[in-house]
């Protein structure tokens, strides 16, 4: 009996950890660094932040300080890659932000301003999202030297507002920029950059989804002044075949499986586990997505 209970407890723990995803590793140059070596470790496992007024929107729950996190040196203009524990599977945009620390990145809480340097939005026609296990972007070459928080977020809008609540999956890396220029981009405060009335926050990806505006400011580039986010409009149909990837159907789970809180437990086409772990229930958010809450 004790053995069976241990197996059940382990199964539930694995389910909890795999319910969502987290950006946990950074690559710079040709080196893939250790898990949470240069990324602040959060305290909510891989669960999302949903409160638009929370300071946790900056660097996730438990990410206000980086005292136990190292800071990596990178050159302005160089590329970097964020890696996840499991590929992003909630539809929605992925964005990267920078915020310059007044001193060391490790002691900075992100209360200054943030500017966006990259968006991965949907492509049209079809509304296909970039659902990947890693995301590579480039630092602007013109920004000033110093220490920064490098923030990545995946905004899950798979559970349309207002029946559901969009989910922010966030991580912050600590970097020291060298070889830069003289530009200090203007930015936005977080929280405050995202509002419940933003079209990209309230979008319903299951109904008349033909264009999309990524929440937050526009992407900064050297020589630009920034501004509001630009909408992603439908593009002419390509003459070549566009190969896209979708999440593979989830295999039917064995009897006794349990979905962790915030995980998917049903919906049209869902073939996975439909039983929620103790303490949560399966709630119908829409025809396509049922969630343990």
Swiss-Prot record:
It is found in: Secreted. It catalyses: [(1->4)-beta-D-glucosyl]n+m + reduced acceptor + O2 = 4-dehydro-beta-D-glucosyl-[(1->4)-beta-D-glucosyl]n-1 + [(1->4)-beta-D-glucosyl]m + acceptor + H2O. O2 binds at residues 158, 167. Residues 1-19 form the signal peptide. Cu(2+) binds at residues 20, 90, 169. Keywords: Carbohydrate metabolism, Cellulose degradation, Copper, Disulfide bond, Metal-binding, Monooxygenase, Oxidoreductase, Polysaccharide degradation, Secreted, Signal. InterPro entries: AA9, AA9_LPMO, CBD_sf, Cellulose-bd_dom_fun. Its main location: secreted. Binds 1 copper ion per subunit. Glucose dehydrogenase and aryl-alcohol quinone oxidoreductases regulate the oxidative degradation of cellulose since they can act as catalytically efficient electron donors for LPMO9E. It comes from the Eukaryota. Lignocellulose is the most abundant polymeric composite on Earth and is a recalcitrant but promising renewable substrate for industrial biotechnology applications. Together with cellobiose dehydrogenases (CDHs) an enzymatic system capable of oxidative cellulose cleavage is formed, which increases the efficiency of cellulases and put LPMOs at focus of biofuel research. Glucose dehydrogenase and aryl-alcohol quinone oxidoreductases are also catalytically efficient electron donors for LPMO9E and can replace CDHs. Lytic polysaccharide monooxygenase (LPMO) that depolymerizes crystalline and amorphous polysaccharides via the oxidation of scissile alpha- or beta-(1-4)-glycosidic bonds, yielding only C1 oxidation products. Catalysis by LPMOs requires the reduction of the active-site copper from Cu(II) to Cu(I) by a reducing agent and H(2)O(2) or O(2) as a cosubstrate. Improves the progression of lytic enzymes in delignified miscanthus cell walls. This boosting effect dependents on the cellular type which indicates contrasted recalcitrance levels in plant tissues. This is AA9 family lytic polysaccharide monooxygenase E.
């Amino acid at each position: 009996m004790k053995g069976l209970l241990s197996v059940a407890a382990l199964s539930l723990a694995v389910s909890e950890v795999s319910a969502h995803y987290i950006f946990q590793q950074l690559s710079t140059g040709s080196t893939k660094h250790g898990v949470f070596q240069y990324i602040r470790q959060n305290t909510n496992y891989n669960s999302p932040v949903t409160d638009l007024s929370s300071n946790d929107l900056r660097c996730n729950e438990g990410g206000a300080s980086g005292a136990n996190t190292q800071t990596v040196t990178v050159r302005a203009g160089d590329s970097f890659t964020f890696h996840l524990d499991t590929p992003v599977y909630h539809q929605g945009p992925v964005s990267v932000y920078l915020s310059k620390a007044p001193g060391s990145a490790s002691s900075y809480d992100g209360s200054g301003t943030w500017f966006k340097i990259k968006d991965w939005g949907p492509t049209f026609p079809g509304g296909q999202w970039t659902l990947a296990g890693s995301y590579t972007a480039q630092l602007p070459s013109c920004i000033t030297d110093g220490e920064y928080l490098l923030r990545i977020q995946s905004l899950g809008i798979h559970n349309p507002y207002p029946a559901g609540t969009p989910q922010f999956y966030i991580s912050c890396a600590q970097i020291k920029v060298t070889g830069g220029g003289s530009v200090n981009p203007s930015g936005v405060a977080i929280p405050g950059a995202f509002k419940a009335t933003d079209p990209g926050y309230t979008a319903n990806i299951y109904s008349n989804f033909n264009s999309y505006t990524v929440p937050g400011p526009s992407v900064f580039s050297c020589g630009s002044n920034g501004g509001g986010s630009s909408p992603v409009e439908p593009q002419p149909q390509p003459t070549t075949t566009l190969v896209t990837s979708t999440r593979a159907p989830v295999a039917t789970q064995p009897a006794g499986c349990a979905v962790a809180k915030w995980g998917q437990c049903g919906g049209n086409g869902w073939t996975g586990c439909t039983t929620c772990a103790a303490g949560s229930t399966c709630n119908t958010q829409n025809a396509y997505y049922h969630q343990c809450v």
